[in-house]
Amino acid sequence: MLPLVALVGRPNVGKSTLFNALTLTRDALVHDQPGVTRDRHYGVCRIDGQPLFAVVDTGGMVGKEDGLAGATARQARLAAAEADVVLFVVNVREGVSALDDDILAWLRKLSQPTLLVINKIDGVSDATVHSEFAHYGFSDVVPVSAAHRQGLDDLIEQVLAWLPERGIGEALDEDSERIHIAFVGRPNVGKSTLVNRLLGEERMIVSDVPGTTRDSITVDLERDECRYRLVDTAGLRRKSKVEEAVEKFSAFKTLQVIEQCQVAVLLLDAGEGVTDQDATVLAAILDAGKALVVAMNKWDGLGTYQREQAEDLLSRKLGFVNWAEVVRLSAKHGSGLRELFRAIHRAHVSALRQFSTSEVNKALEIAYQTAPPPSIRGHVSKLRYVHPAGSNPPTFIVHGTRLKVLPDTYKRYLENFFRKRFKLVGTPVRFLFREGDNPYEGRKNVLSERQIQRRRRLMRHVKRK
């Protein structure tokens, strides 16, 4: 495994900025509002593409043991306990605080190798930087400015000196065989509860407060000899409901996760049915063209009549994505999880399937003969040939003439025909239509000089007669 380095400290000392600087990403949310980071957030520090160590960002510790603050502190303690080296991050501009003293006392009891990282040194004199925290007695002190990437090389060098020798781990590797799954949905439908159930630990903070998860958290899982990468995302609300700037950033990162995943699991609250917020999330998945599994959570809490109502509402509101499998489950009690993974696998296989040009042309020929395109204002579209253009989602390019008048109903017919013929489940199917180009369009027949002379001779001969 890759060795693990944990970033701990009080709120707003720059831990997430340092995380982004070390991992060369923007995976952790950064904002001047304290308390933005709540869960553990993992990344990898690399040099020239080679992974050196894993980094875990934690929420700011405020000394409270109740509510979300307490849950955030527990996540930070778990991260520090599993780390090989702890980076205790402080803010030189604000100086020493009582909260820093409390965190240091806890770290000394933990007995983990710890480096003091003095952040935000830009514009501060060297004398102030070295004297402000001198009484802490650290032998290893690294001044940095995470925002300006100042001092990072020294920090990485000191971290490597403390780390044990290990190989590349699978917790945060770039294994291409892993199925990347994004759990998405509106706030408080049970995404974090479901991921915790799958992992068998309290990896995500779970609360009845909507919007508890603000960042997208990535963890790896092995189940039934298969590898997965799970991403728990912040709940997407309608834009009019997204008020805090931080929540807007979270929503944006959720959209990024949808773009990067292979299979999106849309989690619905079975007791509340399909809401406008659910439709917003679904629209983002469809726009990205991702494989889709619909999961009805909290199914065990419904009676027979309520289940019938939920099924009816689902078929009416989500009938246009009837190609997506629907799984009924309970994240809290763990029922339906095997069916969920089976649906994910079927969607993943369908989304990444490769097609030959001959088989898709045969399918187009049968579809065309079974139901030719209708005549639109006296014009009939002609479909000449098709070829595959990509996967995830399966994409096909159809060439022909008068394709601009091809109605949307016929395009949907082709999608459904291909989906049924090739047994594609859980994935959208895209068709692109290209008009056949006339190779002589815009070209003028220009005679050569020899042809012009010959034409003149012929014309003179005709005139004599």
UniProtKB/Swiss-Prot annotation:
Where is GTP 1 bound in this sequence? Answer: 9-16, 57-61, 119-122
Identify a single GO molecular function assigned to this protein.
ribosome binding
Any one Pfam family match given in the protein's UniProt record, by short name: MMR_HSR1
Query: What positions does the domain EngA-type G occupy?
Result: 3-167, 179-352
Q: Which residues bind GTP 2?
A: 185-192, 232-236, 297-300
Domain KH-like intervals: 353-437
Q: Which NCBIfam families match?
A: GTPase_EngA, small_GTP
Write out the function statement from the record: GTPase that plays an essential role in the late steps of ribosome biogenesis.
Protein family according to the UniProt entry: Belongs to the TRAFAC class TrmE-Era-EngA-EngB-Septin-like GTPase superfamily. EngA (Der) GTPase family.
Task: Tell me which HAMAP family the record gives.
Answer: GTPase_Der
Query: Subunit notes for this chain?
Result: Associates with the 50S ribosomal subunit.
- Tell me what this protein is called: GTPase Der
Organism whose genome encodes this protein: Xylella fastidiosa (strain 9a5c)
Q: What is the lineage of its organism?
A: Bacteria, Pseudomonadati, Pseudomonadota, Gammaproteobacteria, Lysobacterales
Q: Which gene encodes it?
A: der
